[in-house]
Amino acid sequence: MLKDGSMLEISRPCGKDAAEILSYLKIIGGETHFLMMDSNGLGISEEKEAAILEDSLKEERGGMHIGRINGEIACMFSLVCSHRRKTAHTGEIALSVQEKFWHIGVGSAIMETLIKLAEDACVENIELGVYADNVRAIALYERYGFEAAGRHRRKFYADGIYYDQLIMDKYIEVDQNKLREIRKACPR
C-alpha cells in the first residue's frame, strides 16, 4: 500500500499493452528532462513496441515491469541482466514514474521490487545511470544503498544544455552456487 492508501499493482507487460505504454512514455517524456525521450515518446510503432514487450517476457532474469494504480500505468521499470559469463553477476536498472504519482511512495516500491528481482536473478552488482542534477532520484537511490561509482560528463543534451550522468551501483549478497549455474549456462 502506498502513502495515499492506493495499491500499486505490478506486472510484466505484454504486446497488448503496447499502445498504452507508448502513451505513457509520451506523457512522462513531456514532464521532465531527466529521461531519454521527450513528449514525442520513443518514436516507434505500436507493432515494434509490442514485439519488444513480447521479447521481454522471454527474459527469465529481470525484464520489464509496469505498475498500475487504479488501472492506469503509474510507473515502468526494468532490470536488464548480463548474459555473459564474465558479467553474469551484473544488471542495470531503469525506472520512471508519471508525475501525478510522485510523492506517494511509488519510487520506494519500485526500488524494493528491483532489489528483490536482482536478488532472485543472482545479480551482485546492480547499476544505474541518472542525470547528475536529478537530486530527488539520487536521494532515493542512496536511501536504498546505491553509491556513486563514476560520472559521464556531458552525456545528455536537451534544450541547448549538456548534462552529466552519475553512475551508481549497489552490491548485494547472492547465492554463489546459483550464480555459478547461471554462469555455466551463459555463452562465453
Please report, for each region that a protein language model flagged, where it lies by residue:
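Active-site acidic-Proline motif in GNAT/NAT acetyltransferases
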Residues: L95-K100, I104, A132-D133
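Short glycine/proline-centered loop/turn elements that form peptide/ligand docking sites
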Residues: G107, M111, D133-A137, R154-D159
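Terminal substrate-recognition subdomain of acyl/acetyltransferases
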Residues: M1-D4, I161-R188
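Acetyl-CoA-dependent GNAT
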Residues: G29, G41-Q98, M111-E112, L117, ...
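A short beta-loop-alpha structural element at the N-terminal edge
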Residues: L8-S23
